[in-house]
Amino acid sequence: MKKNFLLAFATIFLLTSCGNDDNENNQNAIKPIVGTWKMSKIMMISGSNNAILRSSPVSGCEALNTFEFGQNQSFSIKYYTKNNMECIADGFDTGTYQYSENSKMLTFTYSDSMVESSVVHSLNSIEMMTVDHIEDYNDDGVNDTSVILFKKQQ
């Protein structure tokens, strides 16, 4: 589950600051990500020939997973799983995030000190799309592209 989360968000933000002006700019840069998000669509695209290997809406218990980003650069993820025909909470992750508007890198530092990054392809006040190349989905020896579309919850 962390993989899907990072795929989607690693592309978003890596906040660094060198002075007061940079800090102000960083605070403005993270505002679109602040809030609660849910995955709405996942696509896998072949790294060999750009064919779409999978394109599907997020459904079932996975559609209930929430990704919350705070203004203080904290994040929390709540996961759900199916148990006896109903979705139940199945754990959570917390930590801090940083975003670089220039590189579009979103870096997560989990509370267990694990660090992961993802690339944010696009971000506005209602949608975020992350792109990553970390796995060989179709076992052809070439890493494929994972694209995850998130919708901001109101």
What is each stretch, according to the model?
Residues 1-4, 19:
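Positively charged n-region of N-terminal signal peptides that target proteins for export
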Residues 5-10:
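Sec-dependent signal peptide hydrophobic core
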Residues 19-94, 100-154:
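Lipid interaction determinants
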